[in-house]
């Protein structure tokens, strides 16, 4: 099981209602269901939606920016975006929209400012060397359109009037509280728990 999923499963209490945005193959939705958590997904890939529906998972096909606007206020206890925020057209607009859907938002992403990535870029001189998905991904055709650092995301969260409840260094499974954040230079993957209360 992915480390970020382990952390998310610990964060979300039983009987919660969850929206998993960019749910991919539905693995997290399945894990949440095992914990008696009602989870629904939104996914852009029709192929992945069909796969999820074949597993009996509640997943909607479509653009998250459009679908989320149609949900009623506070329909969910938690909204989750893992490895999704850097692929949406306007992350700030999406986060503001999510405020009406849920009081808690959990967001995970790869830290683009970590030292190893910076060195890799300096040595190669190519953004293509920083892409992790597939060999066919190039800087001009990747879904990864908004690289950001931990500091960038913290600033965005505060600018949008979110409270940072906690942050996690996902790889090392270390939790940070009271506004502290993992190291921008050394943390590879981070998870933020935000609230708009």
Give the positions of each predicted feature.
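Short conserved loop adjoining the S-adenosyl-L-methionine
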Residues: 67-73
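Conserved alpha-helix/loop element of class I SAM-dependent methyltransferases that forms part
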Residues: 1-15
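Class I SAM-dependent methyltransferase SAM/SAH-binding core
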Residues: 27-66
């Amino acid at each position: 099981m992915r480390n970020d999923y382990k952390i998310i499963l610990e964060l979300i209490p039983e009987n919660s209602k969850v929206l998993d945005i960019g749910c991919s193959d539905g693995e997290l939705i399945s894990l949440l269901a095992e914990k008696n958590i009602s989870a629904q997904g939104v996914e852009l890939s029709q192929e992945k939606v069909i796969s999820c529906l074949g597993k009996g998972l509640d997943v909607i096909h479509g653009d998250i920016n459009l679908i989320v606007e149609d949900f009623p206020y506070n329909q969910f206890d938690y909204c989750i975006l893992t490895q999704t925020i850097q692929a949406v057209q306007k992350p700030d607009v999406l986060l503001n929209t999510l405020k009406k859907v849920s009081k808690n938002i959990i967001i995970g992403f790869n830290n683009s400012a970590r030292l190893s990535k910076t060195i890799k870029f300096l040595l190669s001189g190519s953004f293509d060397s920083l892409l992790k998905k597939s060999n066919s991904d190039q800087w001009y055709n990747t879904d990864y359109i908004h690289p950001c650092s931990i500091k960038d995301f913290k600033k965005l969260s505060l600018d949008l009037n979110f409270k940072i409840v906690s942050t996690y260094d996902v790889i090392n499974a270390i939790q940070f509280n009271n506004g502290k954040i993992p190291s921008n230079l050394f943390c590879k993957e981070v998870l933020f728990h935000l609230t708009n209360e």
